[in-house]
């Protein structure tokens, strides 16, 4: 079954928004994500500045 192009775009948008909302609710910030596994830790930071 093939979805129309607009339906596919809406599905992707809903999935992305759901992931963002879940991340925001479970983390302190959307700009920092940490993953710990045993003795290793991976951290991803997003740095941003205003253009003004």
UniProtKB/Swiss-Prot annotation:
One Pfam family in the UniProt entry: HOK_GEF
Localisation per UniProt entry: Cell inner membrane
Keyword set, alphabetical order: Cell inner membrane, Cell membrane, Membrane, Plasmid, Toxin-antitoxin system, Transmembrane, Transmembrane helix
GO cellular component, one term: plasma membrane
Keyword Transmembrane helix among UniProt keywords: yes
Keyword Transmembrane helix listed: yes
Origin: domain of life: Bacteria
TM region positions: 6-26
Main location: membrane
Entry membrane topology: Single-pass membrane protein
Function: Toxic component of a type I toxin-antitoxin (TA) system. Part of the plasmid-stabilizing activity of plasmid R1; when R1 is lost cells die rapidly. When overexpressed kills cells within 5 minutes; causes collapse of the transmembrane potential and arrest of respiration. Its toxic effect is partially neutralized by antisense RNA Sok.
Membership in a protein family: Belongs to the Hok/Gef family.
Name of the featured protein: Protein Hok
Lineage: Bacteria, Pseudomonadati, Pseudomonadota, Gammaproteobacteria, Enterobacterales
């Amino acid at each position: 079954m093939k979805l129309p192009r607009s339906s596919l775009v809406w599905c992707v948008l809903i999935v992305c928004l759901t992931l963002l909302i879940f991340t925001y609710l479970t983390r302190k910030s959307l700009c920092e994500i940490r993953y710990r596994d045993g003795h290793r830790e991976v951290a991803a930071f997003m740095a941003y500045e205003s253009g003004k």
